[in-house]
């Protein structure tokens, strides 16, 4: 009888690949392609649970994955901005909400249940959207599962942030309880590198207000390996990170980052990303073959070469629930190189203003603003453009009428240093409502002791090219 053989094969095939490649519950390939796996993540373990009587959803990965679903894309928010096609994930889809519903019922996770209730209260038909789709539709599961949606602690009871260190993701929101009043920051520095649908955005961050993107990864997923898709969406130049001598991070697992330290609380949170090993020539046999097949050149002219990079550590401190974040970059190379600090927007052009103390870059959306104040040693050469390195041409995706909708341009800011072996950037970002009357009081002030005061926070940071990298953040509010 072949039945035992097939049963053994199917079970072990699922076990080798699922539920995830890690224990923290996140999906390193990004939010868009996470949805491709939803039916497999639910229907297969549900079948095995019914056959054996053992609850396969008791794997701790599923509890972590519920937090990934919530923190990476809070209710009514755009995706955190990782992986191919992330820019198309504007709000939680019906398949995502349906998946959270299944998780809540099968694991008893009340945070996922609250996520579902909040979204369905405003979008009562959302569980019908995509319910029969090939990859994410869970209509068959819902016809069989009679477990109730659990009650208990909800989104207001969660910490303001969560870090997934094995996957290399972090996300912080000032109000998971109410996205309309929430400043969000997402971050990636991943051991998985930029292979498959993951992108070369080690040590990159994105900001949001009311679920709308502000500083955000740019480019379009025109296809998996065409020139725009690789040079302008997958490559580091598309993300809010750093270029070294104009060069970006390797494509492949070799271009990796990691999160060595993190701390989360509602008073102050911290995450450190290390992308020191991410840069250099593309050496992945798989991606070299794909490049050859697609007429791609991983050349210095296109942004890949040896850089002599020794250290790229990015420290991010979220200053409570104030909407302020502080970012400190420690950079070092074997020889003097230029260091380019990148920011991007996909909704509106950026406003840029240079003062003696800092460069002010402002991103806006319909309801929100991110003000970035960039400090460094010496004078930075700045440039802002609305042009991609390679134009985005929609040659692949037509609608039902055969119309190929044009891809819009995005906006790109670059601040480049002179050649230095050691360099530091310090950035204060304030993300807030566009109509915030207190915005005029948020401009950073340089004090006599060279520290920076902004709001109730005092920051000391070594941005010179001498001495050890260091920073200190203190809250100065009394009482």
Which positions does each model-derived feature cover?
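Carbohydrate-active enzyme catalytic cores, enriched for enzymes
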Residues: 36-214, 418-424, 441-479
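Aromatic/acidic polysaccharide-binding cleft in carbohydrate-active enzymes
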Residues: 82-93, 97, 214-235, 240
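Long, repeat-rich segments with strong aromatic
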Residues: 15-16, 20-22, 27-43, 48, ...
